[in-house]
Amino acid sequence: MKLKETLNLGQTAFPMRAGLPNKEPQWQEAWDQADIYKKRQALNEGKPAFHLHDGPPYANGNIHVGHALNKISKDIIVRSKSMSGFRAPYVPGWDTHGLPIEQVLAKKGVKRKEMDLAEYLEMCRDYALSQVDKQRDDFKRLGVSADWENPYITLTPDYEADQVRVFGAMADKGYIYRGAKPVYWSWSSESALAEAEIEYHDIDSTSLYYANKVKDGKGILDTDTYIVVWTTTPFTVTASRGLTVGPDMEYVVVAPVGSERKYLLAEVLVDSLAAKFGWENFEIVTHHTGKELNHIVTEHPWDTEVEELVILGDHVTTDSGTGIVHTAPGFGEDDYNVGIANGLDVVVTVDSRGLMMENAGPDFEGQFYDKVTPLVKEKLGDLLLASEVINHSYPFDWRTKKPIIWRAVPQWFASVSKFRQEILDEIEKTNFQPEWGKKRLYNMIRDRGDWVISRQRAWGVPLPIFYAEDGTAIMTKEVTDHVADLFAEYGSIVWWQRDAKDLLPAGYTHPGSPNGLFEKETDIMDVWFDSGSSWNGVMNARENLSYPADLYLEGSDQYRGWFNSSLITSVAVNGHAPYKAVLSQGFVLDGKGEKMSKSLGNTILPSDVEKQFGAEILRLWVTSVDSSNDVRISMDILKQTSEIYRKIRNTLRFLIANTSDFNPKQDAVAYENLGAVDRYMTIKFNQVVDTINKAYAAYDFMAIYKAVVNFVTVDLSAFYLDFAKDVVYIEAANSPERRRMQTVFYDILVKLTKLLTPILPHTAEEIWSYLEHEEEEFVQLAEMPVAQTFSGQEEILEEWSAFMTLRTQAQKALEEARNAKVIGKSLEAHLTIYASQEVKTLLTALNSDIALLMIVSQLTIADEADKPADSVSFEGVAFTVEHAEGEVCERSRRIDPTTRMRSYGVAVCDASAAIIEQYYPEAVAQGFEA
């Protein structure tokens, strides 16, 4: 027998190396086979419900790291709720209609206009479902637990039917109307866009300063006066029908020296504009307020048949331009609003493809709108005062990445203005995390226009609207309910397969169709109406769910997207928000804080992380960052995260190994019988349990990460486990000291594994498989630990906090002695503490082996007054460090005066000799092997 065999060296097959890329899929397969999701739901039957409603990602392509951040965050929340006394089902969803899928098919050579529409839509459907399958596998590979067999998909008949019912309810309340307002128009998509489909980029544009001649000055201005106008969209001059001034702004008429013309412009801009126009000297002739100029008539710069009326508008500023803006009601929201209010014609001179139309004039017809600036300048002639290139933020189609225009076209709208205040009131009642989200969404709703819900595309849910012979739009509840029933049975494809008459209720008549003829709408709904109806198609439709949801969690871009559209439809139909709380996350940037893009080559795919590190590292990274703001990721950052994971794993491995001979039912020691330091660690750990549980409830993942890492690295590795080895390895296997520590080890091991399960489910399950005394087959079926409190714990914590400070000071003294070559390892030390009465009282109160806690072989507590001149002091406490007296015990590795060679061939101290002689008589008789 060898001497080391008398030590209780922990034994475990739990591997030090995780091998996550290979093991994770094995655990996921085991979960699927055991149907863990359903088992967890069954365990929670009858408990309070918690419903996180999944915002549907778009079904196109593999997931990116932003998807991973979002889905992992949701999974952590749902898992923690499921283990904390809540019935928390999680139904994943997918958004499947819209232009991107049409674009994919177009790139594959599919020509929509050359094939049967039903066949084309079936191709769209098949592609979308293939992407759902692909992304489902991607999400499952992340370890996300969900009802994967019963997701919601926006193209399914039942969902489309529920979406139509939302539309029908809004129409029944008078919230749906048709109008020819200017909308965001994408010539590259040939469709209207919603605000959520817009992104902004900085571009260079040519701006023009030009003048309109006064035709009728209404006794205020002479006809030799010209009103100076500024525009950044020269093509819209073709449709200009008015000039807008600020009602309370001050204007002046100036006469440049040497010019026969006089010019009107904002007074505060005179000097800067004069310099721009090359007016070296000028005279101010008259002063006017904007109100005085109202209804003055001017000539269009080149179209002699058009008059442009001066009108008043509060949107005019002097931040740039001239203080006067030309007004084309067909090409801008502000222009439209003031134009309609003043009776201006709404003229549109650009077609759906961005080409100038016949009404723009023969010189412009057929040209692309963005290429006509030189021609506009030519047509302006000497009315053009200046031209310059400016850099400004401009809206782009988020899918095609092409610029868009405002363009008035007949569209269907949801009248947000009719119930705006109700929406704002609901926002006030909703909890937001971070808190600024409330103001952000509030301001968006307050300032937004009515919602353009029609799209001129094919792949989507048709607008369930019919037209009578006299043009009357029909969308009564009777009709929309019938269409919804048809969609539920056949899918929305039936809209394209049947004539209008066959889509209406049997025997339907309408006074506007005396001949019984009807037409059906060919536009589809905005895809944001699709996902924005999910509260009805999912939360309100499934028996195991409830509406409103407890939580919506998405990226901060969804304040103008899903958070927005869901809120509008829910308030419109039911008068309340679809959610009780909204949690938003920032974007994922690269390690330098730059936006990820394929062109920059700085993207990181979840699949790459899974292959190199494992999904657990990505999951741990999610908890390590403050996702309420933009977060950074890189392979270097993930490598650092994997190091933290390794520390956590190896600490838990140590606990597994050193409780391998511990049966909690037989060997556990009651709290009151634990050693002082063991009680301290029990109290300390329960504080961590409390912190983590509260952080889970607050969705504060970073607080969980910090609590776990600090406890594992500081409280366990750097303190408790550091000296505990000298007990659990060296003391007799069944000794009270060892069983006390094992009790604490096992308690921490089991509870910390449960606490980590929502974050590191694969690792937690692997650990659980080694805990043979636990009843649950899988840790996911266990319950979260509840923090305990103990009598007198505050006093105990205070005492140990003071000791930890003293221990830190002692470690500094030991380090100095090590540097001075007095000792090597701390176990070679004889440490003397020159203690005040206060420190002596503290050390006595701890009732502990202080030498053990300091990890020194010998310790002396001396009077503070006796400190020698060569002592070292830290924060008022003096220490001396000498080499310990005696020889090294071959078993405990401590230096001990009682160490001597024994008859059985080893040099050990009396304490080790007693253990050997009691428990290993055969070795005593035969001697130990070398």
Curated annotation (Swiss-Prot):
Keywords assigned by UniProt, alphabetized: Aminoacyl-tRNA synthetase, ATP-binding, Cytoplasm, Ligase, Nucleotide-binding, Protein biosynthesis
UniProt-annotated binding residues for ATP = K598
Q: Where is this motif: 'KMSKS' region?
A: 595-599
A single Gene Ontology molecular function, please? tRNA binding
Instruction: List locations, semicolon-separated.
Output: Cytoplasm
Residues noted as binding L-isoleucyl-5'-AMP in the record, renumbered to the chain? E554
Motif location ('HIGH' region)? 57-67
- Record-linked Gene3D superfamilies: 1.10.730.20, HUPs (3.40.50.620), Ile-tRNA synthetase CP2 domain-like (1.10.10.830)
Predominant location category: cytoplasm
**Source species, domain of life:** Bacteria
**What is the stated purpose of this protein?**
Catalyzes the attachment of isoleucine to tRNA(Ile). As IleRS can inadvertently accommodate and process structurally similar amino acids such as valine, to avoid such errors it has two additional distinct tRNA(Ile)-dependent editing activities. One activity is designated as 'pretransfer' editing and involves the hydrolysis of activated Val-AMP. The other activity is designated 'posttransfer' editing and involves deacylation of mischarged Val-tRNA(Ile).
Q: Which family does it belong to?
A: Belongs to the class-I aminoacyl-tRNA synthetase family. IleS type 1 subfamily.
Q: How does it assemble?
A: Monomer.
Full protein name: Isoleucine--tRNA ligase
